[in-house]
Amino acid sequence: HYKAVAAPSSSTVFNGVLRVEQDAQETNAFQKSSNLMLDQPGSGIPSGKVHAKPELQILADNVRCSHGATMGRLQEDAVFYLRSRGVPQDEARRILTLAFALEIVDLVPDEVLRQQMQNTLEALPSF
Protein backbone atom coordinates (compact mmCIF):
# COMPACT_ATOMS: atom_id res chain seq x y z
CA HIS A 1 0.00 0.00 0.00
CA TYR A 2 1.46 3.33 -1.11
CA LYS A 3 0.29 6.66 0.27
CA ALA A 4 1.27 10.15 -0.79
CA VAL A 5 0.31 13.68 0.16
CA ALA A 6 0.53 16.22 -2.65
CA ALA A 7 1.01 19.64 -1.10
CA PRO A 8 0.08 22.71 -3.14
CA SER A 9 2.35 23.09 -6.19
CA SER A 10 3.99 19.68 -5.60
CA SER A 11 3.78 16.42 -7.49
CA THR A 12 3.91 12.74 -6.59
CA VAL A 13 4.60 9.75 -8.81
CA PHE A 14 3.70 6.11 -8.21
CA ASN A 15 4.72 3.53 -10.80
CA GLY A 16 4.01 0.23 -9.10
CA VAL A 17 4.58 -3.13 -10.74
CA LEU A 18 3.34 -6.34 -9.18
CA ARG A 19 4.74 -9.29 -11.12
CA VAL A 20 3.60 -12.86 -10.52
CA GLU A 21 5.81 -15.45 -12.20
CA GLN A 22 4.37 -18.55 -13.85
CA ASP A 23 5.47 -20.89 -11.05
CA ALA A 24 3.84 -18.70 -8.36
CA GLN A 25 0.43 -20.38 -8.53
CA GLU A 26 -2.19 -19.55 -5.88
CA THR A 27 -0.65 -16.15 -5.23
CA ASN A 28 -2.92 -13.66 -3.48
CA ALA A 29 -1.70 -10.07 -3.93
CA PHE A 30 -3.06 -6.54 -3.79
CA GLN A 31 -1.52 -3.23 -4.80
CA LYS A 32 -3.01 0.13 -3.85
CA SER A 33 -2.04 3.77 -4.25
CA SER A 34 -3.89 6.28 -2.05
CA ASN A 35 -3.22 9.96 -2.65
CA LEU A 36 -4.31 13.03 -0.72
CA MET A 37 -4.32 16.28 -2.68
CA LEU A 38 -4.08 19.44 -0.57
CA ASP A 39 -5.24 22.85 -1.67
CA GLN A 40 -4.20 26.31 -0.59
CA PRO A 41 -6.43 27.20 2.37
CA GLY A 42 -9.43 29.13 1.14
CA SER A 43 -8.96 28.29 -2.54
CA GLY A 44 -10.79 24.96 -2.54
CA ILE A 45 -8.81 23.85 -5.59
CA PRO A 46 -5.95 21.33 -5.27
CA SER A 47 -2.88 22.59 -7.11
CA GLY A 48 -0.63 19.57 -6.55
CA LYS A 49 -0.34 16.84 -9.15
CA VAL A 50 -0.68 13.11 -8.58
CA HIS A 51 0.50 10.52 -11.10
CA ALA A 52 -0.45 6.95 -10.18
CA LYS A 53 0.10 3.93 -12.39
CA PRO A 54 -0.48 0.61 -10.64
CA GLU A 55 0.38 -2.30 -12.91
CA LEU A 56 -0.11 -6.06 -12.70
CA GLN A 57 2.04 -8.49 -14.68
CA ILE A 58 0.46 -11.90 -14.22
CA LEU A 59 2.19 -14.90 -15.78
CA ALA A 60 0.46 -17.56 -13.65
CA ASP A 61 -3.04 -18.96 -14.22
CA ASN A 62 -4.31 -19.61 -10.70
CA VAL A 63 -3.91 -16.29 -8.86
CA ARG A 64 -5.96 -13.69 -7.09
CA CYS A 65 -4.51 -10.24 -7.71
CA SER A 66 -5.99 -6.76 -7.80
CA HIS A 67 -4.88 -3.17 -7.86
CA GLY A 68 -6.27 0.31 -7.48
CA ALA A 69 -5.54 3.99 -7.14
CA THR A 70 -7.50 6.70 -5.36
CA MET A 71 -7.04 10.46 -5.30
CA GLY A 72 -8.97 12.85 -3.15
CA ARG A 73 -9.04 15.92 -0.98
CA LEU A 74 -9.57 16.41 2.72
CA GLN A 75 -13.19 15.76 3.56
CA GLU A 76 -14.86 19.06 4.30
CA ASP A 77 -17.25 17.44 6.78
CA ALA A 78 -14.28 16.17 8.79
CA VAL A 79 -12.70 19.64 8.79
CA PHE A 80 -16.08 21.11 9.78
CA TYR A 81 -16.45 18.61 12.62
CA LEU A 82 -13.07 19.51 14.10
CA ARG A 83 -13.76 23.22 13.69
CA SER A 84 -17.10 22.80 15.49
CA ARG A 85 -15.07 21.42 18.41
CA GLY A 86 -12.93 24.55 18.58
CA VAL A 87 -10.00 23.37 16.46
CA PRO A 88 -8.70 26.14 14.16
CA GLN A 89 -8.97 25.37 10.44
CA ASP A 90 -5.21 25.09 9.83
CA GLU A 91 -4.84 22.68 12.75
CA ALA A 92 -7.86 20.64 11.60
CA ARG A 93 -6.29 20.25 8.15
CA ARG A 94 -2.98 19.27 9.76
CA ILE A 95 -4.62 16.66 12.03
CA LEU A 96 -6.47 15.04 9.12
CA THR A 97 -3.38 15.04 6.89
CA LEU A 98 -1.27 13.45 9.63
CA ALA A 99 -3.96 10.83 10.28
CA PHE A 100 -3.87 9.88 6.59
CA ALA A 101 -0.07 9.53 6.57
CA LEU A 102 0.28 7.85 9.95
CA GLU A 103 -1.94 4.93 8.90
CA ILE A 104 1.05 3.62 6.95
CA VAL A 105 3.63 4.56 9.58
CA ASP A 106 1.68 2.54 12.15
CA LEU A 107 2.36 -0.59 10.07
CA VAL A 108 6.16 -0.29 10.41
CA PRO A 109 7.21 -3.14 12.74
CA ASP A 110 10.43 -1.52 14.03
CA GLU A 111 9.42 0.77 16.90
CA VAL A 112 12.48 3.04 16.64
CA LEU A 113 12.02 3.57 12.91
CA ARG A 114 8.28 4.04 13.34
CA GLN A 115 8.86 6.75 15.97
CA GLN A 116 11.45 8.50 13.76
CA MET A 117 9.00 8.52 10.86
CA GLN A 118 6.22 9.87 13.06
CA ASN A 119 8.47 12.63 14.43
CA THR A 120 9.50 13.61 10.90
CA LEU A 121 5.89 13.84 9.74
CA GLU A 122 4.83 15.83 12.77
CA ALA A 123 7.67 18.33 12.18
CA LEU A 124 6.54 19.12 8.63
CA PRO A 125 4.93 22.52 8.06
CA SER A 126 1.17 22.87 7.61
CA PHE A 127 -0.25 23.45 4.15
Identify what each model region corresponds to:
Residues 1-127:
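Active-site gating/interface segments in enzymes
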